[in-house]
């Protein structure tokens, strides 16, 4: 479980303020909000890239507030995926294992294991510049998951995908999460992604979480009103399905 208490992070004139937030083990937690409200600042604080002025971040009762990124066992997939263009797919996925000094046999085995789960074994020898947007996303996901993180952070993971690939990727990542059961924190400004993927939605406004609710509850709030045209077609579907119960 991740527990955040009395947290303040300053970045220029911007302040991220979190009085109390709990994210459960194995949860798919979606952070929703428009641009500029602090969603990426929140992820970078969890990763240890930004240092709080005050407050605590705990994981299973252990205070990790001042731990360096490499000690936290968190993995981040940035919006642009940040793949290494001079490496093939195998070496991109293996990068985090190599810098940990692990054996070649171990690296080869676990890279092929995660590539099989993500259905990308057939592209391991290709250069990343030759990949489609959906393939790049899966490579970035494989590179993050191969180090077996306790928490996976996703920053607008579908931003560069067309609507068809976006829908396909939603289903794929949800299926992988259900299989591997890591804790996921997914940042987006897209309410459809939030409703269809989240166990719970945390809505951010001006650097604060103003509500944390289950998707079926969130769509009834004032914070969902700006997205009304997008969510109306989903309302009946959610009402009559077991999705996100």
Feature-to-residue mapping (PLM):
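ABC ATPase NBD coupling module
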Residues: 63-78, 99
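Conserved ABC ATPase "signature" region
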Residues: 105-123, 174-175
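Conserved ABC ATPase signature
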Residues: 127-131, 135
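A short, proline-enriched helix->beta-strand linker immediately N-terminal to the Walker B motif
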Residues: 146-150
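Catalytic Walker B motif of ABC-type/P-loop ATPase nucleotide-binding domains
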Residues: 152-156
């Amino acid at each position: 479980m991740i527990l955040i208490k009395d947290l303040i992070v300053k970045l220029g004139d911007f302040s991220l303020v979190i009085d109390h937030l709990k994210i459960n083990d194995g949860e798919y937690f979606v952070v929703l909000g428009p641009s500029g409200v602090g969603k990426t600042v929140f992820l970078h604080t969890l990763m240890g890239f930004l240092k709080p002025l005050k407050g605590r971040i705990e994981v299973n009762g252990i205070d990790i507030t001042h731990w360096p990124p490499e000690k936290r066992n968190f993995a981040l997939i940035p919006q642009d995926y940040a793949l290494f263009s001079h490496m093939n797919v195998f070496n991109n996925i293996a990068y985090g294992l190599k810098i940990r000094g692990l054996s070649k046999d171990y690296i080869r085995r676990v890279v092929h294991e995660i590539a099989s789960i993500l259905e990308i074994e057939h592209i391991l020898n290709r250069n990343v510049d030759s990949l489609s947007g959906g393939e790049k996303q899966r490579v970035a996901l494989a590179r993050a998951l191969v180090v077996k993180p306790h928490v996976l952070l996703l920053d607008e993971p579908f931003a560069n995908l067309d609507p068809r690939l976006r829908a396909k990727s939603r289903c794929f990542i949800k299926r992988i999460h259900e299989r591997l059961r890591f804790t996921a924190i997914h940042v987006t400004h897209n309410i459809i992604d939030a409703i269809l993927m989240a166990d719970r939605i945390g809505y951010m406004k001006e650097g604060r979480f103003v509500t944390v609710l289950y998707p079926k509850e969130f769509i009834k709030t004032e914070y969902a009103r700006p997205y009304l045209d997008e969510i109306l077609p989903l309302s009946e579907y959610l009402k009559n399905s077991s999705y996100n119960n």
